[in-house]
Amino acid sequence: MKMLILAVSCLLAITGSLAADTCYNDVALDCGITSNSLALPRCNAVYGEYGSHGNVATELQAYAKLHLERSYDYLLSAAYFNNYQTNRAGFSKLFKKLSDEAWSKTIDIIKHVTKRGDKMNFDQHSTMKTERKNYTAENHELEALAKALDTQKELAERAFYIHREATRNSQHLHDPEIAQYLEEEFIEDHAEKIRTLAGHTSDLKKFITANNGHDLSLALYVFDEYLQKTV
């Protein structure tokens, strides 16, 4: 009975094919061999040389890992500003939001990796050279905003790097689907976040330097109240 079902499946697969390709060849090969199972190793979601040439596939996995790491970094800052000593609820809210967004992007990238027929590997590293130092959560308010701004620029520049790798327009490296995904889900979003954080950094600097810095505590308190209402 199993052999009959297998034979019918093979017949349907072969007669339903429009052209001979890798998946079709796997089906035809397995149907020509006496077996109780169909392996079909190339009947998957991989196409366009994704994962076979260049480093777009590995870079995308490394990008998911980077978002995960930055999500935890932001979460550490959120916890630091939420303790009883610092007591900056607005800053904590801002960093918690950044952490949640980075976490959400991590999940989204992993889903897209599997959508393209690949598996997520958290051991992948980017080939892009960076000079980033270890993240420190216990920064004062202006330093924390500056660090967040640098982090968002890091994520944006990594997206540019992957986009450039995906759009080389060569026989094996061109992947417009990945390029479109980055443009729609990351690049515009990064521009908005960078502009917002740059604005926060500039505004806080003006608060701090007003009146020659004599009202520092009041300036930080007022700005934290502002973040609580706007984030």
From Swiss-Prot:
GO terms for molecular function: ferric iron binding; ferrous iron binding; ferroxidase activity. Disulfide bonds join 23-43. CDD domains: Euk_Ferritin. Its main location: Golgi. Keywords: Disulfide bond, Glycoprotein, Golgi apparatus, Iron, Iron storage, Metal-binding, Secreted, Signal. Residues 50-208 form the Ferritin-like diiron domain. The keyword Glycosyltransferase does not apply. PANTHER family: FERRITIN. Stores iron in a soluble, non-toxic, readily available form. Important for iron homeostasis. Iron is taken up in the ferrous form and deposited as ferric hydroxides after oxidation. Ferritin is composed of a heavy (H) chain which is responsible for the oxidation and uptake of ferrous iron, and a light (L) chain which facilitates the nucleation of the ferrihydrite iron core. This is Ferritin light chain. It comes from Trichoplusia ni (Cabbage looper). The gene is Fer2LCH.
